[in-house]
Swiss-Prot record:
Its cofactor is a divalent metal cation. A divalent metal cation binds at residues 8, 46, 70, 119. It holds the Pfam family RVT_3. The gene is rnhA. It comes from Bacillus subtilis (strain 168). This is 14.7 kDa ribonuclease H-like protein. It comes from the Bacteria. Keywords: Metal-binding. Not known; does not have RNase H activity.
Length: 132
């Protein structure tokens, strides 16, 4: 069964202080991460959430991963391995590079209300960002 990873990025301003939330469910255990990422746009934060989630899974040696995001641009760019807005191209290139670590890689768009844990973690990361 694939490891499930819920990712979300948030920004207090566009751009503004930003954070990412990552919620991982692996073999009956759950891990939560709130990571401040400095000043970014909301869409940049969404891409960075996926990238950081992929890095966490790769370092843990997970082979089969299923990511969930409420960002349709991140889901589409990852599936198509391209993006119309060249601003996001470096993120897509990093995602393509990281995908090679996983024999089975899935990504699925979900409505925001199904991604509440990652959303709360991302908002907490903004608060942590603002404290520093």
């Amino acid at each position: 069964m694939p490891t499930e990873i819920y990712v979300d990025g948030a920004s207090a301003g566009n751009p503004g202080p930003s954070g990412i939330g990552i919620f991982i469910k692996h073999e009956g255990k759950a891990e939560s991460f709130s990571i401040p990422i400095g000043v970014h746009t909301n869409q940049e934060a969404e891409f960075l959430a996926l990238i950081e989630g992929m890095k966490l899974c790769a370092t843990r040696g997970y082979q089969s991963v299923s990511f969930r995001t409420d960002s349709d641009i991140v889901e589409r760019a990852t599936e198509l391995e391209m993006v119309k807005n060249i601003t996001f191209q470096p993120f897509v290139e990093e995602i393509i590079r990281l995908k090679a670590a996983f024999p089975l890689f899935f990504i699925k768009w979900i409505p925001g209300k199904q991604n509440q844990k990652a959303d709360l973690l991302a908002k907490e990361a903004i608060r942590l960002n603002e404290k520093n």
